Amino acid sequence: MVKLLLVGFVVAGIILGTQANEYLDFNVTEIDRIEELEFGFSKYSSNLNPLMVGLTLIRGADSGAVCLDGTLPGYHLHRGHGSGANSWLIQLEGGGWCNNIRTCVYRKTTRRGSSNYMEKQLQFTGILSDKAQENPDFFNWNRVKLRYCDGASFSGDGQNQAAQLQFRGERIWRAAIDDLKANGMRYANQALLSGCSAGGLAAILRCDEFRNLFPGSTKVKCLSDAGLFLDTADVSGGRTIRNLYNGVVELQSVKNNLPRICTNHLDPTSCFFPQNLISQMKTPLFIVNAAYDTWQIQSSIAPTSADPSGFWHDCRLNHGKCTPAQLRFLQGFREQMLRVVKGFSMSRQNGLFINSCFAHCQTERQDTWFADDSPVIRKKAVAIAVGDWYFDRAEVKLVDCPYPCDKSCHNLVFR
């Protein structure tokens, strides 16, 4: 069995799945496996009384806004109140991508490709919590979690009739926005578009478009959590993630829905990488990312396909088992990430929280968003950093010292 352990101040072991090969036998990519493990952990949150929010289906079939299998997409909405009654936070769900017919067909049998399999209620924790002691700046906002069932970060617009696949992420995005505007978002005086992992990438891709939905008087910003996927070589020198993204962009007809400010001078696959977008964006953006992102270590840097000898097997699952040479390689990845955000961080309107943890997605989990023992940089937790930036209380450009200096991390270990 696969166990996910949270190592740091909190240690927990939770059985979550089966061995990697069994996942591959069931036509799910390793990328989806890691997403399932890490998002699955939130179901075992230490929050003893979490807010449960019901699923609302979006009646967008007439416009073609459907999941991979043709079912209706959906979202979870918890209404704001008091000073937050006209403030809106839209959280885009993550969950990997599908880059070929086989993996997309598999997703049709899961919540990542069909609303038939989506949870009818979800816990709202972290940035979605309704408790001031857990979510000090956004607890009373209208908070929405838009479910992810297209496999291309809400960006595709095509179909494959032979496989009965609908690639309609872009239409899902538009139908959801229209539905939320009709439900009061059109009157927002403050708005934040956020997302985790594949949803964090989507928040970057859609950020400027989101800004344009509102009048100039509305305060609009964006937040990407664990969405800074780097166009980097794997341990064999190959381009695992570029090949993956190329498949997604080609299969799902993503090209025409990418920001024109990028596609007017770069190829579409390059424009699916945040590093080619973030410095050109007009809307203020905050990036939260672990410098040693466990998803990228396991699925981009050292996937099993790039490591046939198994030399990286132990290290990719547990940083405590990395050799000095492997740690140097991972330090190089951190340095590449810092180079990518250097120009972006020069803009006063942008914000940054890059901690030296082995983690992935830190805003929806209560223990990493805002708790007594949350990860901190210069004594500032993620929730406080994001709030200070959004409300212009302070300029926030927080970059951690390299591993292993940060003792506040909630590092993930897989066994």
Curated annotation (Swiss-Prot):
Similarity comment text for this entry: Belongs to the pectinacetylesterase family.
EC numbers, comma separated: 3.1.1.-
The encoding gene: PAE12
Subcellular location: Secreted, Cell wall
Superkingdom of origin organism: Eukaryota
Signal peptide residue numbers: 1-20
Known function: Hydrolyzes acetyl esters in homogalacturonan regions of pectin. In type I primary cell wall, galacturonic acid residues of pectin can be acetylated at the O-2 and O-3 positions. Decreasing the degree of acetylation of pectin gels in vitro alters their physical properties.
Glycosylation sites per record: 27
Null mutant phenotype: No visible phenotype under normal growth conditions.
Name this polypeptide is given: Pectin acetylesterase 12
Major location (coarse): secreted
Cellular-component GO terms for this entry: extracellular region
GO biological process: cell wall organization
PANTHER family to which the protein is assigned, alphabetical: NOTUM-RELATED, PECTIN ACETYLESTERASE 12
Induction / repression: In roots by the parasitic nematodes Heterodera schachtii and Meloidogyne incognita.
GO molecular function: hydrolase activity
Catalytic site positions: 197, 293, 360
Keywords, in A-Z order: Cell wall, Cell wall biogenesis/degradation, Glycoprotein, Hydrolase, Secreted, Signal
Organism whose genome encodes this protein: Arabidopsis thaliana (Mouse-ear cress)
